C-alpha cells in the first residue's frame, strides 16, 4: 500500500523525552495504517475532508451562512 500521502515532515526532531515517546507512538501508528487498507482509506478521507474544510473556511467571505436557530424556535 502507498502511504506517501501521510505528511509528517512538519514535525521536527525530538527535544524532550516525552516527544521521543510521541515519536515512537506516531511511527507505530503510521506503520499500522500502512498495512491496513481500510484504515488507509479512512485516513485518506479524513485528509481530503480536512483539505475541503480548510478551503471552505478560506472562502468563507464568498458565502453567507443562514442561521438555522430561527427555524428551530417554537412560537
Curated annotation (Swiss-Prot):
| InterPro entries named among the record's database cross-references | PA/PA-X
Query: Which proteins does it associate with, and in what oligomeric form?
Result: Influenza RNA polymerase is composed of three subunits: PB1, PB2 and PA.
Reported function:
Implicated in endonuclease cleavage of capped RNA primers. Displays an elongation factor activity in viral RNA synthesis. Dispensable for viral transcription, but not replication.
Biological process terms from the Gene Ontology for this record are: viral RNA genome replication
- Highest taxon in the source lineage: Viruses
Question: Which keywords accompany this UniProt record?
Answer: Phosphoprotein
One GO molecular function term of this record is: RNA binding
PTM section of the record: Phosphorylated on serines and threonines by host kinases, including human casein kinase II.
Natural source organism: Influenza A virus (strain A/Camel/Mongolia/1982 H1N1)
Membrane-spanning residues where?
Answer: none
Its encoding gene is what? PA
- What is the official name of this protein in its record? Polymerase acidic protein
Give yes or no: UniProt keyword Iron-sulfur: no
Q: Which family does it belong to?
A: Belongs to the influenza viruses PA family.
Amino acid at each position: 500500500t502507498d502511504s506517501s500521502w501521510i505528511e509528517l515532515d512538519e514535525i521536527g526532531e525530538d527535544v524532550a523525552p516525552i516527544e521521543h515517546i510521541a515519536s515512537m507512538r506516531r511511527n507505530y501508528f503510521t506503520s499500522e495504517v500502512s498495512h491496513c487498507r481500510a484504515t488507509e482509506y479512512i485516513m485518506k478521507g479524513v485528509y481530503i475532508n480536512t483539505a475541503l474544510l480548510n478551503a471552505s473556511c478560506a472562502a468563507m467571505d464568498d458565502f453567507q451562512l443562514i442561521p438555522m436557530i430561527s427555524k428551530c424556535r417554537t412560537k
